[in-house]
Regions:
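Conserved RecA-like P-loop NTPase ATPase core
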Residues: 15, 23, 35, 72, ...
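Conserved AAA+/SF3 P-loop NTPase catalytic/coupling segment centered on the Walker-B
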Residues: 92-116
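AAA+/P-loop NTPase substrate/partner-engagement loops
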Residues: 57-78
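Conserved alpha-helical scaffold flanking the Walker A/P-loop in AAA+ ATPase domains
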Residues: 78-95
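Pre-Walker A (pre-P-loop) alpha-helix and adjacent loop at the N terminus of AAA/AAA+ ATPase modules
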Residues: 2-32, 38
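Walker A/P-loop
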Residues: 28-63
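Short loop/turn elements that form and flank the Walker-type P-loop nucleotide-binding site
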Residues: 21, 28-30, 54, 89-92, ...
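Conserved small/polar residues in nucleotide/adenosyl-binding loops
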Residues: 124-130
Length: 134
């Protein structure tokens, strides 16, 4: 089954079986991975293809200097005299953080904390979905 999955993903990602195996190992172990590579090398395609093959959800966060922690984690909205939490993109199975080094220290810290602790803090602790790969 594992080899079939690798072969299916390899149809979209040519020549990167080692990256595919490492990414799948991270998903199985509910860990995280850091892929540093040149632009256009297929990092986003790899994440999307794995997501499709496993039937998971995918979100992408583009880190910029003006990105706020609430843009990643979510925020409270006042609706009908009641605070409702609007979940951010971190609340998905696979999150691709693009240009993480360009984010502000607060945004990086919020993202890395959620990644490590598998929860986000917004007045209460909210648990991230299982099989969350960041």
């Amino acid at each position: 089954m594992f080899e079939t999955l690798i072969n299916n993903i390899s149809k979209s990602i040519v020549g990167n079986k080692e990256k595919i195996k490492l990414a799948l190992a991270a998903i199985i172990s509910e860990g995280s991975i850091l892929i540093e590579d040149n632009p256009g090398s297929g990092k986003t395609t790899l994440a999307k293809t794995i997501t499709l093959n496993l039937g998971l959800n995918f979100k992408r966060v583009q880190f910029t200097s003006d990105l706020l922690p609430s843009d990643i984690l979510g925020f409270n909205i006042l609706q009908n005299d009641k605070l409702t939490f609007q979940k951010g993109p971190i609340f998905t199975n696979i999150v691709l953080a693009d240009e993480l080094n360009r984010g502000s220290p607060k945004s990086q810290s919020a993202f890395l904390e959620a990644m490590e602790e598998k929860n986000a803090v917004s007045y209460t602790h909210l648990t991230l979905p299982t099989k969350a790969l960041v």
